[in-house]
Amino acid sequence: MMRRPPSQGRWSASHQKLLLAFAFILIPWLQLADAQQQPQQPQIRIHSQRGDAPLDKVADDANTRWYATHAAPDVHPEAKFDTVNRKQKQQSTASPQQHQKYRRAPYDYASKDKAQNRYAQHPIRESEKPNYVKVPNDASALATLAPAQPVRAPHTSRHHWPSSSAASGLASPQNARSLEDWEVEDFVLLATVDGDLYASDRKTGRHLWHLEVDQPVVETKHYRTNNSVLDDDYRPVDHYIWAVEPSRDGGLYVWIPDSGAGLVRTGFTMKHLVEELAPYAGDEPPVVYTGDKKTTMVTLDAATGRVLKWFGSSGSQVNEAESCLRPNAFDDRDTTECSSMGTITLGRTEYTVGIQRRDGRPIATLKYAEWGPNTFDSDLYQQYHASLDNHYITSQHDGRIYAFDKSQAENDLPLYTHKFSSPVARVFDVCRPWDANAGSNPELVVLPQPPIPALDESTVKMRSNSIFLNQTESGDWYALSGRAYPLILDAPVAQISRDDLWDMAHAFDSINPNKLSKALVGTHFLNPVKSTGYHQPPTLPAGALDEYYEDLENASNNAHAVTNTVPEEPTIITKVKALPQSAANSVIDFVSNPILIIFLIGSLIYNEKKLRRSYHRFRTHGTIKDVYPFFVIESEAGDESGDDKDGVFPSSPSPRSQPQDQNAEDHLSRHKVERNAGDQDKVKDNRSLHDVSDTLEPSNKTVEKTADVVKQVDVAGPDAPSTDSNGAAPEKKKKAHRGRRGGVKHRKGRPTDGSQSHENDPALTTVDEAVSNAKKLGDRPSLEPDVMTIYNDMQAVTGSVISMGNIEVDTDVELGMGSNGTVVFAGRFDGRDVAVKRMTIQFYDIATRETKLLRESDDHPNVIRYYSQVQRGDFLYIALERCAASLADVIEKPYAFGELAKAGQKDLPGVLYQITNGISHLHSLRIVHRDLKPQNILVNLDKDGRPRLLVSDFGLCKKLEDRQSSFGATTGRAAGTSGWRAPELLLDDDGQNPAAIDSSTHSGSHTILVGDPNSLSNGGRATRAIDIFSLGLVFFYVLTNGSHPFDCGDRYMREVNIRKGNYNLDPLDALGDFAYEAKDLIASMLQASPKARPDSREVMAHPFFWSPKKRLAFLCDVSDSLEKEVRDPPSPALVELERHAPEVIKGDFLKVLTRDFVESLGKQRKYTGNKLLDLLRALRNKRNHYEDMSDSLKRSVGSLPDGYLAYWTVKFPMLLLTCWNVVYNLEWEKTDRFREYYEPAGL
């Protein structure tokens, strides 16, 4: 690398000899003059000051032995390693005046000029290939990566700098060195976001060398397995977007969806998180931060960028011998002189921050690797507040850099500009000591260049509030702040920062991830009200103001005011001169625009037929007038039929039914009309499509669209299973889309295109006849009984709305997403709002089964209503009842669905009863849902403001045939969603024998022995009971606001806990009076044995759903019935009742009741405190004599029926269920008195 222009090159050989003789005479006089100016000052090696301890000799010997065994084989043995004996010298004290004389001595400047001439003879060749360096994990890796040199020389000893301090020999250089002793080199180092390092000429921007690294500066990995709020494990923190600023310790930013805050500056850096914060575990939300730090150091040859040394925690590598270059290898081949501009020592620090939830699920992994100076030079770095020569280089958001010379205040034009593949993250000024010897190889100092200072306070504020967010090619997010990168103020504003984006999509979950990424790229503006503080998202602790931002502000305010944007041309003359070049650039950009090229090519392909016909017309007729009718009719009909062929025929799942030469036949059929007499029937069957095209004018498009719809139905129909004459479905041995389809004759050709004209067909003379024929097409019976035939006109696609007869689909409004490419859009059907479920054609069988089951079951208020189905192109569209939200939406985001959430909280038993009622309706039709979860339960509000729950998503439903009570699991893997499936499905899914599982595995009081041979019914086959198990999970989810009984500390252990039967119902205790009934019901529904679970009607009859009035009436009826039993000896009914007394009363119930209530009891009859019969009698008597109680006692026991019932159930929570089970055990549930208590509550 050259430090001065090539014109100052080496002299000739004769001149060199004269100079050598002159120097030989002059040197003694220079030494004498120097001795007269100041006392002799011993030179001290800088490296010895860095810690030359007595162990250095041992270290050098060890390095010699290591290098001898690990050096590259092509290195000469004498050049492998050269151990230099270090002798520590003492430094004499010098006064400040002497120091000034030494620093400004004429010898320094003369030696500097000599150094300029010396380096000028070795310009860096542009053809030199960039070095690719992969930062190794071990020391031996560097030997294979270091570039080979054609000329090698022995290792030179370390060079030292003269001391600039008057301190003693033990003084630290950090306390002695001054930045005034240094000058900037003629090149700068540029570190880009992709991790590479460039060296460029400081004044011209010419590229000198390039060091490639395989690791980018920023890596952000987000773990988003749940992409929708409909997922059961959705948490807002999972959707935070983290970004790292690639400058000054890695400032951390986070974009928080649905918070209104947008992009937030956390006030933390990667360095701070790793070194001071991590490990950190928070509680709200439960998030854990961990971090680690890895440092490496490399020494580069300043002239070539080659790696000389590498030091890391795993080892080190020294390849200095390979960097030696002879100054003139062609002329002085025998010389051993090495030429070098010096060496550069750079540190690379890698920070890794792991962010996980406390349940072990990862949220994000952030990595930041920054180039930085040697920490030993921190004393100079702390003094470096402004560029030494007032030259500044800064980068735009697109990777273009600008260089400014601020030594002249009136000149605001950039010196040069250069474009890099990625933005420049950091700029490093390279400095060398003023007093470096001419022949020395000094260690250059790298200092990060301060940012360009702001022009005024308003500019400082704009910088502080502006953040540019972007992604690398690998999808990692990084941020560029206006403080560190002033030119990002000219970057485009991010779409998401505008209000109009959120007008289209209010919820973060409704935005497509790709669209969200595009919307986030651009400039974001921090809240100006909060810009003075640094905000921590809910996952981070509140901390002090980060030094990162303070330093940037100080760097901006302490320097001279300069402009912060790329300046415009100062005069109109310069603008006029630039017009020709600007116009040429615009034309070149326009012509080379890939979008324009793609558009032109697409237009040519799309209009190929029209262009051919036009060319043929002009060749044949010469004018357009002669052939105008033929041209218009043929093009219109041909275009629509062409669209139909492309949109419908490829969607057919039966490639066997379409010959390879089909397109050729269709093409020929549009130009050749040759038919035999025996084909007249086929012509009549298809004639309407051709006749309509042949007779209608271009303005009459409705008939063409009608024919298009009929054609679509004819094509879609054969894909469904066929039915025989009696309507019975034959047994399917293969899927419907294999082989011959639905009884349709296996024709080699397809129906001819609608744009044909037929000479043998009778022409339609009027439009009315054409319309009449088109209408008659709809009278033909559809071959697919599960697809509704639509007779209305097929509308064209206008914008994002697709009209298909009665169905309109707005593809811009996405309501939800499912598996296998299923998307739910907003739409309309016959004027009412509907949800349109779009499925790919590959899942035709699933859609057909779903619609058949929907038709059978939608006549119920708690089952989703089905409207219609239509096929278009490669998709099937199913119109369903549209709901406001799913149950998961309401539970997880009550703030977004406040009205629904409030309505549901008022009557939780009613909500759960409706869900059970819908499942009971399906079970009554012998339909098993198999995928019951909160996401598949939808919520709407009735006109009276009450919530209405609907069971939806019948894609995995299974209908049991007559006399069938069970079925096997799905081949390959059991149906359902992970975490919401019954244990018998999991066991069948694993292919395990339940009896082979360890039956001794248990945990807590809720353990179910999986090894019980009765745990599975029908030899491991599933029944309706799998829906009851999932329903129990839904019950717990609703009553606990989103919890899962099988989490047991870790969500990822759900299915393991389901297999083992480990669940926890303690969170239900928060329900108060209803807690015991809720626990009993859910525990019965979560039984491992399907036979032990109640059916849907038994669930609906459980006392949990009873009103307080019904509960109190039941207890009084039980007391009345038992009072009639014989007491001496006690009847079996009394024995059964009193058997449960100890666990219900737990002692003496009279001691539990209040004193005034017990005193009021004594007026009627005597009571025994340990008798359950007496407790029921007391409850019944005071209920019947409630009006006889005093006002104070009424206030004590509460009002009827709610307060009075709670007075007893709070003290005796097991009372109601115990009596309910006693009556059942006595078989009284069939009597007239108790029958209503064992039938569905009918809420």
Swiss-Prot record:
Entry comment on modification after translation: Autophosphorylated mainly on serine residues; phosphorylation enables nucleotide binding by the active site.
Cofactor(s) this protein cannot do without: Mg(2+)
Cytoplasmic side: 607-1243
Compositionally biased region (Polar residues): 90-99
Glycosylation sites: N226, N470, N554
Residues that, per the record, bind Mg(2+): N936, D953
Biased composition (Low complexity): 163-172, 650-660
Protein localization: Endoplasmic reticulum membrane
Binding site for ADP: S819, K837, E881, C883
Principal subcellular localization: endoplasmic reticulum
Listed name of the protein: Serine/threonine-protein kinase/endoribonuclease IRE1
Organism: Hypocrea jecorina (strain QM6a)
Encoding gene, per UniProt annotation: IRE1
